[in-house]
Amino acid sequence: MASIRWLMGSRLSRFVCPFAQLVRQPVLRYVRPPVRALHRGSVRRAAEKNPLNSRARAVEQQYITELDKADALMLRKSHETGFLSWFRNGLLATGIGVIAFVQSDVGREAGYAFFILGGMCVSFGGASYVTSLLSLRRIMLLSLPAVLLHTAVVSSAALFWLCAVSLYIGRLEVEIIHDEDDEEHGADESSECAECRARRDREKGQDK
């Protein structure tokens, strides 16, 4: 009986072991990934708690922030260079207009044209600079007070240019009008003196 039981047990174990292995493999497939995920999560938490790793991450974030600041500064400088180029062209056109304004009547008309050209350059440069500030404020890392300050500086520069041109044109117009009046009065005086001399000559001839 003992031998029969031993033979039956060995045969059953032979049939049961392969079946148990087949059942065990898919179960382990679904069980092992969560275990690995938990293990990775614990390792990651331990790495985050490590002060050396946290310092390295802080240094990396600070480095990226410095790069962003450098890019924003370069962008601001490029926009300022664009505005200054437009303003310089406006001043150049204004200077040519000043030179042409004092030449003659034709030069005066050309001077007005150059003044208008200078105003277009100054106004377009200022408007494009302010628009770029408002649209790219976040990329330039500028706060609202800084944007308002830049806008006030650009507007004041354009206003000073307009005041200078207006005062110069007005003063030249006044001087030109005075010169024309003096010439007319001088011509009148010279004509009157000629008439007076003619009268004197006539009176002298009658006396003789």
Curated annotation (Swiss-Prot):
Alphabetical list of InterPro entries matching this protein: TMEM160
Keyword Zinc: no
Annotated membrane topology: Multi-pass membrane protein
Gene: tmem160
Disulfide bonds: none
Biased composition (Basic and acidic residues): 194-208
Subcellular location: Mitochondrion inner membrane
Protein name: Transmembrane protein 160
Keyword Transit peptide attributed: yes
Organism placement in taxonomy: Eukaryota, Metazoa, Chordata, Craniata, Vertebrata
Transit peptide: 1-45
Record keywords: Membrane, Mitochondrion, Mitochondrion inner membrane, Transit peptide, Transmembrane, Transmembrane helix
Record family assignment: Belongs to the TMEM160 family.
Region feature (Disordered): 181-208
Bias kind Acidic residues: ranges: 181-192
Domain of life: Eukaryota
One GO cellular component term: mitochondrial inner membrane
Coiled-coil stretches noted in the UniProt entry, renumbered to this chain: none
Transmembrane segments: 82-102, 110-130, 147-167
